[in-house]
Amino acid sequence: MKFTKTVKFLGIEERKMKDGRLFAVTFFADGTAFTVYVVEKCADLSKLLSLQFGKELAVTFRLAPYDNAWKIKFASLA
């Protein structure tokens, strides 16, 4: 799935799982808050962590299913 949305980042939470770490990233877009689960701390997540939460910005990203979770693949950060 590929999305281009103006989103507001609300928060990120690290959850310890039996086989590693899972990161829950919460966005607010189109009047709805939604959470994406990121299965690894990759370069894409580092970009996300460097953003100022609560700031609205246009993001193009693709969600790829990975081991019963979603992995964020950023195409661009406006």
What are these regions, as identified by a protein language model?
Residues M1-R21:
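Structural detector for short beta-strands of small beta-barrel domains
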Residues R62-A78:
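OB-fold/S1-family single-stranded nucleic acid-binding modules
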Residues C42-T60:
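Short nucleic-acid-contacting surface segments enriched for D/E, G, S/T with interspersed K/R
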Residues M17-E40:
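OB-fold (S1/OB) nucleic-acid-binding surfaces
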Residues G11-E14, G31, L63-P65:
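Beta-strand elements of well-folded, non-transmembrane domains
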Residues K5, A24-V25, L57-V59:
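Hydrophobic residues positioned within well-ordered beta-strands of beta-sheet architectures
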Residues T35-A43, D67-W70:
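Short C-terminal domain-edge/linker segments immediately following a structured domain
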Residues F9-G11, V38-A43, A78:
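A mid-sequence interfacial segment
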